[in-house]
Amino acid sequence: IQETLKQQNTQLEREQTSYHREASRLESLRNITERYDGYGNSIRRVMEQKNHVPGIRGVVADIIHVEKNYEIAIETALGGSIQNIVTDNEDTAKRMIDFLKRNKFGRATFLPLTSMHGGGGIRNLEALKEPGVIGLANTLIHVESRFDGLADQLLGRTIVVDHIDHGIAIARK
């Protein structure tokens, strides 16, 4: 009887450990789903893999931090790229594209950091001296230094102005 009881206790401990591990995983997936509510299925599926696949950094919206008064301008400048998935390199991006295809989860756009070298800046630096110019969009955000190339690529050619009329005047020149 003692041996049977010991075996059952050992089995119970294994089952409890397994239960807690799965409960923790479920909670983690729920948090990801809630956090990425409003994103496409493919993006949510990739972000569910973030803790299991090294090299997934997050979506652009998670990486770029903006002061409240510039949020609308930066979100507008980013457009759909705000939901693009940032990876360390092309291999991680390829792996996740394969994951999406294999499971028929849809498509997503990936931005490997190894391919982000800036957008070359604006052609006419004189435009920054025009009335109403606040600055280049990439200078109005905060990112970790490893994401500087990404920020430059996405926002380094966008001038933020205080009023649409100033923007129109600059665009016409």
Regions found by a protein language model. Name each.
Residues Q7-R14, T87-N89:
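Conserved short loop/turn motifs at secondary-structure junctions
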